[in-house]
Regions:
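Acidic, Gly/Pro-rich loop/turn segments at junctions of secondary structure
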Residues: 1-21, 73-80
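Residue-level recognition of the GNAT/N-acetyltransferase active site
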Residues: 3-5, 27, 101-102
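Secondary-structure junction motif
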Residues: 8, 22-42, 106-114, 121-124
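Beta-alpha-beta core module
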Residues: 11-12, 56-105, 112
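Short beta-strand-to-loop elements that line the ligand-binding cleft
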Residues: 26, 45-54
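Conserved glycosyltransferase catalytic-site signature
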Residues: 32, 54-55
């Protein structure tokens, strides 16, 4: 995610090499987990200017030009910010899982959620 006037906003996709050395606004915990893993695996040395505890705050700071950030695509759908969202040129994905106790009498909400997730995963050919 970049500001609208950031040089990377002009590209259709962004490579890992493109973000090496860029100023970053990152969530405090994500740097140690998913984004940090992405950086380590691809030998990226970010210039972390700010660590933020809330994703939307990070996006607002990016909008104002404080740096760029890396966030899950699911979070970025229909966001109310004037930012540029670009995919990576290289393939990168994360695994999501649903864990629950398989006990009789699942709540209606959980039952509906599991049905939805299963249908969606099949439509996306994930299972």
């Amino acid at each position: 995610v970049t500001s609208l006037d950031h040089p990377l906003a002009d590209q259709l996709t962004v490579s890992f090499a493109d973000i090496d050395g860029q100023d970053f606004v990152l969530s405090a915990d994500d740097f140690d987990y998913e984004t940090g893993k992405l950086f380590r695996l691809n030998h990226i040395t970010p210039n972390v200017r700010f660590r933020i505890n809330e994703d939307y705050t990070a996006i607002k700071m990016v909008e104002q030009g404080f740096g760029i950030t890396v966030l899950p695509k699911l979070l970025l759908h229909n966001i109310p910010f004037n930012v540029c969202v670009r995919s990576f040129t290289e393939h990168f994905r994360r695994n999501l899982a649903v864990a629950y106790l398989d006990t009789p009498g699942l709540s209606p909400a959980l039952d509906k959620f599991l049905t939805f997730v299963t249908k969606w995963a099949k439509e996306c050919k994930l299972i």
